[in-house]
Amino acid sequence: MKLDAITTQPVVETARFVLRPLRRSDAGLIEFYTKDERVACQTTTIPHPLPPGATETFINRCLSVEREEDVWAIDASAAGWSEVVGLVSLERLSRNQSELGYWVAPAFWNQGVASEVSAAIIEANPMENDTIFATVFQDNPASARVLTNCGFEYVGDAEAFSVARNAKVATWTYIRKFT
């Protein structure tokens, strides 16, 4: 694990990807992917349609010293793919806990991207958490498999509001404890 000099956010490498802090130059690809309803509807926070300026605002928030989460670009250029194929994040919670989130562009689905990058972030544990939570929509069992394959345990059902769907959506909540 290497530290990025600007943000002090670690760079995490996997066999195929480099998980690195976002750059302003990532805006075009992030916007292209998040405009896709299939991506937005599997998240709680991405609106659909994506309003003008939303991506730049998101990147500015991610680069802020006062940010509440660390967000990594999934850089696949070393594998001969796109420079950004998705994002993975850890949002800081109280009591040395965080919440894992990720999305992958549809062109790269079913290729193990989410599993590989989630496992790498969990192994690196860059925030030195005791516990990491994750929540997935119940209509996305592939994301649930990613979590169970990374050692997460199911803890219960809940609901979360999806901005893109403009509705509450049934979720499964998972936990991974380190201590």
Residue map of PLM features:
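Acyl-donor (CoA/ACP) binding surface of acyl/acetyltransferases
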Residues: 1-38, 74-179
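Conserved GNAT-fold acetyl-CoA-binding loop/helix
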Residues: 38-60
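A short hydrophobic/aromatic micro-motif that marks alpha-helical segments and, especially, helix-coil
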Residues: 41, 50-52, 66-67, 127, ...
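Juxtamembrane/interface motifs at transmembrane-helix termini
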Residues: 49-53, 61-63, 105-106, 138-140
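A short helix-loop-beta-strand connector motif used in the catalytic cores of GNAT acetyltransferases and
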Residues: 60-73
